[in-house]
UniProtKB/Swiss-Prot annotation:
Assembly, per entry: Homotetramer; dimer of dimers.
Known cofactor(s): Mg(2+); K(+)
Organism of this sequence: Methylobacterium sp. (strain 4-46)
Binding annotation for ATP: H17, D169, A170, K171, K235, F236, D244, R250, K251, A267, K271
Sites where the protein binds L-methionine: E58, Q102, D244, K275
GO cellular component: cytoplasm
Pathway info: Amino-acid biosynthesis; S-adenosyl-L-methionine biosynthesis; S-adenosyl-L-methionine from L-methionine: step 1/1
Protein name: S-adenosylmethionine synthase
Reaction(s) this enzyme catalyzes, per UniProt: L-methionine + ATP + H2O = S-adenosyl-L-methionine + phosphate + diphosphate
Enzyme class: transferase
Amino acid sequence: MARSDYLFTSESVSEGHPDKVCDRISDTVVDAYLAEMPEARLGVETLATTNRIVIAGEVRGPDSVTFARLEELTRAAVKDIGYEQDGFHWKNADVAIYLHAQSADIAQGVDASGNKDEGAGDQGIMFGYATDETPALMPAPIYYAHKILKDLADARKGRVGEAAKLGPDAKSQVTVRYEGGRPVEATQIVLSTQHLDESLDSQGVRAIVEPYIRAALPGSWVTDRTVWHVNPTGKFVIGGPDGDCGLTGRKIIVDTYGGAAPHGGGAFSGKDPTKVDRSAAYAARYLAKNVVAAGLSRRATIQLAYAIGVAKPLSIYVDLHGTGRVEEAKLEKVLGEILDLSPRGIRTHLGLNKPIYARTSAYGHFGREPDRDGGFSWEKTDLVATLKSALA
């Protein structure tokens, strides 16, 4: 029997975290190619360290996207994040680009030809999850860990009061107490943030960030019992890639559900939407969110599995965690009928062949508001009526 009273913790990292800098750059490259050629293929990895950025990977796209243009976009991304420090500066960092053509062996398995539909770009398993414990149908710990950092980043970049003294690199962690299976209280709050003023100590930083943290959390969640850990090492001036080397794809739990749901292991950033690590994970979230939004369950986990070069998923698995109002086996059948879960079908339905990915690189790929230009389309709940009708 599932526990109903427990503590659960999730963490988030800011857009200035070294790994997130790399995710942002990799997705900036993806967007640059998709803007010129919606069918472009990319697998782009980025490394960032002290005043050096290395971009490498495989590309099939137009020659109009030059390395000079990619360097310009990379510097603009780093500038937007806020890095203008001696050890990592958008203007002075060395940018090296090593992109080459996609493997023909991979392309032949993925490309559509004759009667063969477009196949998956790789094998793998992908999970989607939704829960009714927040308005965004996301687990509360990761949802609020993201919100804290996003609000602080907005204040820092907008130079709002004392928040202007903060740097781009930050991490948050929220421990939530559940009672009767519902989130009711934040028992522990961890916030480490870079600061530009070397005279600031932990108390000084807490004075800056605490109002934003309290505003981000539900009003009753912060109590006299809540334990705070703000910059517990005392000083955090050297940050970002100058303090720790960053790599694309190292924050896959931050990107998804904060550990509250399984993860298939594949990262998202730097990949075009033919790669099911990304597109099928988005589709699984889309399905799970619509299941919960339709009132068919309070929680839903969906797994999809693929083989390279094969169009249709090998399996669909649904777990409603004992909260369902419909048989899981029936739902598994219906989900495969109401949405074409081939790579092409997912990309077409969700409109994924667009430059919409740089914005996903920080503060979570899920639990976001859909954008008018098609960004975060997998967060829509437009399958609710179709689901209900198919199950009637």
